[in-house]
């Protein structure tokens, strides 16, 4: 032990606890090490351990442990226990003033345990509370999970993400430690509530609303649609809140009524002419087909690559099914999730020359985990994907960012750098691109969001009366991707309340990475392969040099110095995100001007 320490006894005890924490590989190592260093460096002699609270790293709990240790040491060695400095000062002041001792404070009652809403302990207590209070038999783990899962936002069987190993079931340990639950039986363990556990469960049950907690159900009030999941509900007023999703505003006076979405409608579908109260769109030359509200159902479509892990590919679809949503899983050319209107009559669209019976809705989700977002920023996919989303013509793009554990030391330079990168990416996505950014805690939170969005779109397009109209742009009247975007822009400007779209197969062809690419598209994609060349910068270069050949020939006409500065000099009048510096100009010249 260091002879220079002013309080060697206290230092020795802290060292003992530090060594014990290291042996147990406990998280307390950091706490004890900090306290040890502070005590070792302190030049003051403490008469009582409570005086050590003034040191960095020594809090009330640690000082209390030191006091207990000192008390035991004094008793063992027949020494008087030093008086607490505050009590000594108070008794001295009292004796000086001749005033009686004030009454002792009543000990503060420990607060009753209250688990967080829809947490693991919360769900387990409610699951066990389904038993009769006087029942002698408990529930097995499998039985309890089945009853508790509807009350919990996290899964009892699968970790929140592949990098973690705990599930909501791990919270059973907390309930056992607090003696709210007891287990009995071997080898098949059964669980039941103790008397204290029943008291907590009864308090929780008083806060529960009526109804089935295992469904995402619609409940309509005056002017409000409530999409409920358990006892946590997201209220979506008829003017759609951005907390649920971006999008057009609905009429506040709409009364929401439940409609059957099973598509068993025997009545023939009648086409509504688009000249009802509107002028024909002569200048566009397009005649959209209006789909009646009762002629289709809303279907969620997921990309085949949207999986929980390589060994658990059906987790997302299975969890959505539990919430009453049966998704379609197929390869998507763009985005990770989207919604289509599937016609109840499979032959309805074929009479207009369409090869598909599904019409795209104006909503698409691009899902990114934190680690995937960082990777896409580094390799340029982030800007390329946003560029393709912008060219897709989809009006409501939801950029969903899912939290994920990233192994970096908090406070390190790399962690700070990555945090800045993500903050900048999120801000640019919202401000520059105008996309709605939704952040979720984990995959289960993402699944709940997709379910709520599906119900919201069903309400918008399928309920009677519908708040939104869906119109199909015939594929035969579109000649290219550019004509599709131009047509969309003009139709939306003419009637913003109508959703104009194309069939799913047409949309897939228009947004394909390889099919129907013009020379301009190929040139832009080639430019964006260079790190630092965003979609905006690529467009600026393409406007100045129309083709790759023209771009290369421009380099060939210059000497080496001229090639390095060519892009910078020819585009230096540009401002904002389109502006290119000399470093980027040289990088482009190294790629495109080599051998000129």
Curated annotation (Swiss-Prot):
Residues 299-405 form the ERCC4 domain. GO terms for biological process: DNA catabolic process; double-strand break repair via break-induced replication; mitotic DNA replication checkpoint signaling; mitotic intra-S DNA damage checkpoint signaling; replication fork processing; resolution of meiotic recombination intermediates. Residues 229-244, 253-267 have a biased composition (Polar residues). Residues 77-113, 228-278 are annotated as: Disordered. It comes from the Eukaryota. GO terms for cellular component: Holliday junction resolvase complex; nucleus. The keyword Hydrolase applies. The gene is mus81. This is Crossover junction endonuclease mus81. Its EC number is 3.1.22.-. The keyword Magnesium applies. It holds the Pfam family ERCC4. Interacts with eme1. It is found in: Nucleus. It is an enzyme of class 3 (hydrolase). One of its GO terms (molecular function) is metal ion binding. Interacts with eme1 to form a DNA structure-specific endonuclease with substrate preference for branched DNA structures with a 5'-end at the branch nick. Typical substrates include 3'-flap structures, D-loops, replication forks and nicked Holliday junctions. May be required in mitosis for the processing of stalled or collapsed replication fork intermediates. May be required in meiosis for the repair of meiosis-specific double strand breaks subsequent to single-end invasion (SEI). Belongs to the XPF family. Its cofactor is Mg(2+). Keywords: DNA damage, DNA recombination, DNA repair, Endonuclease, Hydrolase, Magnesium, Meiosis, Metal-binding, Nuclease, Nucleus.
